[in-house]
Curated annotation (Swiss-Prot):
Its EC number is 3.1.3.11. Homotetramer. It catalyses: beta-D-fructose 1,6-bisphosphate + H2O = beta-D-fructose 6-phosphate + phosphate. InterPro entries: FBPase_C_dom, FBPase_class-1, FBPase_N, FBPtase, Fructose_bisphosphatase_AS. It is found in: Cytoplasm. It comes from Methylorubrum extorquens (strain CM4 / NCIMB 13688). Mg(2+) 1 binds at residues 92, 111, 113. Mg(2+) 2 binds at residues 111, 114, 276. This is Fructose-1,6-bisphosphatase class 1.
Length: 348
């Protein structure tokens, strides 16, 4: 159902619960996350006036050096979730699952601060989350070792020129923008539909020498533009913040790629399945797009550990399908072009 622009996130959640009463706990959890996001947005917006938010501290669960803002965001979201109907939280900033309310119905996977490398230079950062039902039993990890299709909701926050809250409860994807006059998230993009094709891709091209054949071939053909097999010119974008690239794809289409590569520890890429790729995949699919790991649908993947990684390709359906053709052999393999050959501008 189309909703009036400018209506609040609270109004939207009320309508979703009226449509599906079983979503009441999910809606309450989203309200808590949105309140925390407003607080984090205020801190991000102050920049260096809030202190050295890029100051390095300890290492997180994945071995990355934590920045001061990573710790601030993690703490604020955990405080918010303590007041929500949440039993367990899997956070990028915690090695193990954190148990909150025993007997509560939901489990939340969250990256409190996506795009940490952007903190010190005033660029976009964000938050990503996915909400799932609790799996009964004594193992706190069990709730997260299920397919992404079990998510009841997913969302991300973009802390940029505007603060946006992008969310789905399985009934379409919507963008709410923070109105700073009253600190309320208001609807600005309703029931989004990703265009099926667009001439824009996002990838970190500095890793070209590490990519496998299908990715090299796909990007090579995009670079050839109107003179190559794609018959049109492409633009490349890369922000080093998954949330920013995801929001751009939602609004104007295109494709995002973070593939696995041949660097040590990167066979499954760098993004984490539970609190990065699965939530983004849910949002993208709910907007009519596609999301794959190159071999299959992201939402059908089942994590075997909390911080498991996953390759990710998402965006306009025709482009995602095009990438899939390179992976399954329906397009020629890499190594046929001087662009990525031994004598080319970009050596493999």
């Amino acid at each position: 159902m189309t909703k009036p622009y400018g209506s609040s996130l609270d109004d939207h959640l009320d309508a979703e619960v009226a449509r599906e009463p079983s979503l009441a706990d999910t809606a309450a959890t989203i309200r808590a996350l949105a309140a925390a996001a407003i607080d984090v947005s205020e801190t991000v917006g102050r920049g260096s006036l809030a202190g050295d938010l890029a100051a390095q501290g300890e290492h997180n669960s994945d071995g990355d050096v934590q920045k001061a803002l990573d710790v601030i965001a993690h703490k604020r979201f955990m405080q918010a979730l303590e007041e929500a109907p949440v039993a367990q939280v899997a956070s990028e900033e915690a090695e193990d699952v954190v148990t909150l309310k025993a007997g509560a119905p939901l489990a939340v996977a969250i990256d409190p601060l996506d795009g940490s490398s952007n903190i010190g230079v005033g660029m976009v950062v964000g938050t990503i989350f996915g909400i799932r039902p609790v799996t009964p039993g004594e193992d706190p990890n069990a709730s997260f070792l299920t397919p992404g299709t079990t998510q009841t909701a997913a969302g991300f926050v973009v802390y940029g020129p505007a603060t946006t809250f992008v969310v789905t409860l399985g009934n379409g994807t919507r963008i709410f923008t923070l109105d700073r006059t009253d600190n309320v998230f208001r609807l600005t993009h309703d029931a989004m539909k990703i265009v099926p094709s667009a001439s824009e891709y996002a990838i970190n091209a500095s890793n070209v020498r590490h990519w496998d054949g299908p990715v090299k071939s796909y990007i090579e053909d995009c670079l050839r533009g109107s003179e190559g097999p794609r018959d049109r010119d492409f633009n490349m974008r890369w922000t080093a913040a998954l949330v920013a690239d995801a929001q751009r794809v939602l609004i104007r289409g295109g494709v995002f790629l973070y593939p696995g590569d041949n660097r040590k520890g990167y066979a499954q890429g760098r993004l984490r399945l539970l609190y990065e790729t699965a939530p983004i995949a849910f949002l993208i699919e709910q907007a009519g797009g596609g999301a794959t790991d190159g071999q299959g649908r992201i939402l059908e993947r089942v994590a075997t550990k909390i911080h498991e990684r996953s390759p990710l390709v998402f965006g306009s359906t025709e482009e995602v399908e095009c990438v899939a053709k390179y992976y399954d052999g329906r397009q020629p393999s890499a190594g046929r072009s001087p662009l990525f050959g031994q004598r080319g501008l970009m050596r493999s």
